[in-house]
């Protein structure tokens, strides 16, 4: 797949450039057929400590955008697309947030999958991941990212609903098998929740993020 880029002008920030210095960063990655404004709507529920940056995925998908082609179109195409998205996000971090004191990721659905791919590619670059209704993509990856994750065990919040009609059971099972040995996992299952985020889940996410960005005593 050809290379892609993050549109700097489409990024929604919670703080001005002057107010971002010396603060942790939380990057929001939306789901398939959505846009940067979607997850940014969650920002009032999130802790104030991190600067929030909500990115727009680079591929057009209907009226919205996507990080990679759907798995239903073929695993190889999806993985190649996700790999290109990871390249684009890492390049964006280099130019837009080189001085962030730490970087966390929060992704929904396909954005959750990309957040885990970022963790696999650059395990030491990210402090934590919030994976909402997301999943891990199949297959092995080049390099030693997975082995390094097994050593580092970064904090990962994985929230999902029991009534999600979108994410296949096979993807859930694959994620359930993959995450525990490669993260310090906080798995939450919400009864009756579909492919969305509930207020209860948001409260749990806020507590999780707050614990990750709290100053060390």
Residue ranges and their predicted role:
Residues 2-101:
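Serine-hydrolase catalytic machinery in alpha/beta-hydrolase-like enzymes
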Residues 55-59, 130-138:
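Active-site nucleophile loop of the alpha/beta-hydrolase fold
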Residues 106-111, 115:
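Gly/Ala-rich beta-loop-alpha elbow adjacent to hydrolase catalytic centers
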Residues 117-128, 135-136:
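Conserved hydrolase catalytic core segment
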Residues 138, 162-167, 195-196:
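Acidic catalytic loop of the alpha/beta-hydrolase fold
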Residues 152, 157-160, 164:
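Short beta-strand/loop motif that positions the catalytic acidic residue
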Residues 170-217:
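C-terminal catalytic histidine-bearing segment of alpha/beta-hydrolase fold enzymes
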């Amino acid at each position: 797949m050809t290379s892609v880029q993050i549109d700097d002008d489409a990024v929604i920030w919670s703080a001005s450039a002057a107010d971002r210095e010396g603060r942790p960063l939380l990057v929001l990655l939306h789901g398939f057929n959505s846009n940067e404004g979607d997850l940014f709507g969650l920002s009032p529920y999130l802790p104030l400590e991190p600067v929030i940056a909500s990115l727009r995925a680079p591929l057009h998908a209907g009226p919205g955008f996507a990080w990679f082609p759907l798995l239903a179109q073929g695993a190889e195409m999806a993985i190649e697309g996700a790999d290109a998205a990871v390249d684009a996000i890492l390049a964006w971090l280099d130019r837009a947030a080189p001085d962030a004191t730490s970087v966390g990721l929060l992704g929904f659905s396909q954005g959750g999958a990309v957040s885990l791919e970022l963790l696999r590619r650059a395990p030491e670059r990210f402090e934590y991941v919030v994976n909402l209704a997301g999943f891990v993509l199949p297959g092995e990856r080049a390099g030693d990212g997975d082995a390094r994750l097994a050593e580092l065990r970064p904090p990962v919040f994985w929230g999902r609903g029991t009534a999600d009609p979108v994410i296949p059971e096979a993807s859930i099972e694959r994620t359930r098998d993959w995450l525990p040995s490669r993260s310090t996992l906080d798995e939450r299952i919400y009864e009756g929740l579909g492919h969305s985020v509930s207020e209860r889940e948001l409260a749990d996410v806020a507590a999780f993020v707050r614990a990750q960005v709290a100053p060390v005593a």
